[in-house]
Amino acid sequence: MKSDFSDVRGFNYQLSTGSTSLENWLYYDPTIYELELRRGKEYFPGWNTIRLWLSWDAYFRRPAVFKERFESMVSIADRLGLKTIACLFNRWHDVSGFDNGGVYLDNFLFPQAWAYYVPLYESYVSDVVGAHGGDERIVLWDICNEPWPYNEFTEPIMGVWQAEFDWLTRMHKALKAAAPDTPVCVSVHNYLGLDGLRWVDPISDAFSIHPYYMCTSDNLYDPKRRAKYDQHIREYVEYARSVGKPLLATETCWGAETDEERAEIIRFTLETLTKYNLGFIPHALHYGATADLHTDDDSFMGETYLPFINKDGSLRAGHEVYNNY
C-alpha cells in the first residue's frame, strides 16, 4: 500500500447483527464476519482496506477475549486481501437518537466524575495497540471517530474543546509508546472543515476526513452544491500538502433511501475524490442493526441509509459503480 494512502479502496464495516459496537464485539461471530466480508470481495474485487470500529467498553468486560476477537478479525481480513484501519474510540452520536455508543463528556471532562475513564482508556490503548506493534496488517490507527461532535463552537463549547483535545493527546501518547512506527490519524467530521485538520495536526501522521456530499433528492444535482463540494475537497488537499501529510477519506458517500439516488451520490463523490488522487473508505459495506444501516423493517431509520449490500446479501442496484474508481 502506498505511503500516501492514495490506493486505498475501502469500506467501513460493522457486523450486521448488533445495534451498537459494544454488541458486535460482545457477540462476535467469526462465521458471519467472514461471510459478509466475502460478499464484499465478490461484489468489489478491488476492495483492499477495512475500517474496523473497536469498542473500549467491550474490552473492559473481557480484555483477553476482546484481543482474541480483534486478532480474529484482522486475520480473516488479511486472508481476504484486506489491510485494516483500526478505530479505537468513537465520538459520533447519531442525531436521531439511535446511538452507537462510544465516549461521552463525563469520560474525559472532569477527573472528579464517576465515569472519568481517561486512565482506563490509556491502559486499553497500550494493551490493544501494544499487542500489534509492527503488525503490517494494520496500516493506520485511528484514535477517534469524529471528535468534537457539535454544530457550532460557542464559548461554552470551546471549554469542552480543550478537554477533548487533551484527552486525544493522551491517547496519542499512549498509542505512540505502544506502536511508534504505525501511522496515526484522527477522523474529523464534515462540519469542522479545515479547522478540524489544524486541530488534529499535532497528533496525526496522516489526515483522515469524512467528506460526505450531504444532499437530498431536491439538491442532488445542484451545480452550485457540487462546485462547493469540489472546492471543499481541494482545500483539504491543499492544506494537507502544505504541511506534508497524506490525506485519506475514512468515511464518505452520503446515503439515500432509493438505490438510484445513492448510486449517483457514490459516482459523484468518488469521481471528485479520485480527481484529487485520494483514497476512500465509504460508509458502509453491509446492511446491519447499527444506526443508518437499516430500514424501518428493523427499527426506526437514522439520519440516512448508507449500506452497499442489502440485508439478503444482494448488492444494492447501481452500487457496483464503486468499481469504476
Where in the sequence are the language-model features?
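Active-site mouth of glycoside hydrolases
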Residues: 1-204, 242-243, 273-290, 294-305, ...
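Residue-level signal for short, function-critical loop segments
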Residues: 56, 190, 210-213, 253
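Active-site flanking residues adjacent to catalytic metal/cofactor-binding acidic residues
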Residues: 141, 145, 209, 250-251
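Substrate-binding and catalytic surfaces of secreted/luminal carbohydrate-active proteins
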Residues: 223-276
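Short, charged, surface-exposed secondary-structure boundary motifs
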Residues: 21, 216-220
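Short, glycine/acidic-enriched loop or turn micro-motifs at the edges of active sites
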Residues: 145, 149, 213, 254
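His/Asp/Glu-enriched short active-site or ligand-binding loop at hydrolase and phosphoryl-transfer sites
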Residues: 210, 216-217, 281-284
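Short glycine-rich, flexible loops that bind phosphorylated cofactors or substrates
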Residues: 59, 215-216
